[in-house]
Amino acid sequence: ESHTFKEIAQMGLEMLGTVREEQVWKAVRLAEQSLAQLGADWVLEVSHMGYLFGLFDALGVPEVARPGLLEKLREKNAHELRRAARAAGVDDAGADALTGLLELSGSYEETLAKAEAACRNDRMRAAAAELRALAKTLEAAGGAVRLDLSLAGEMEYYNGLVFQGYLQGLPRPL
């Protein structure tokens, strides 16, 4: 138990209807600018749920097992992720691919190159292409943006780009 409050002050942005890439990029830029306004050292981590879902599809992960695997990814618990993957019928090579997501984290360009090389299907390639397009926008903006493909949102809710920000001195994402 964390002994922290159950309520969390947070801010979000939701886009309804057809969402174009430019709108997504603007949302990421807004997050960057918001963190920069706080004046402390900051990091913005970016991921794409399409990459995770594409890997699940490629490995034949049953729908019922996916929320549990996402939970283990969020916890960054390689041992339990492997165990849950094997319990879901994923072979050793597939479990290696899932735990490998935990290593797809770091500088945006280097991590994206590794992610592109690991794509197994069109869904993963499409997510990587969207992250590549976003990289061009981020280069122009500067800032401390990292790619972390183990960053996973709630399965029922998030389906595309996800991101969260950190400030120096705070133990949790904003």
Predicted regions and their residues:
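A generic structural motif
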Residues: W42-S47, G68-K72, D148-L149
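Hydrophobic mid-domain F-helix/FG-region of cytochrome P450s
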Residues: E32-A36, G50-G60
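Acidic, His- and aromatic-enriched active-site or binding-groove loops in soluble protein domains
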Residues: V61-R86, V90, L167-L170
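Short glycine/threonine-rich loop-to-helix capping motif typified by GTGT followed
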Residues: L55-E63, E156-F163
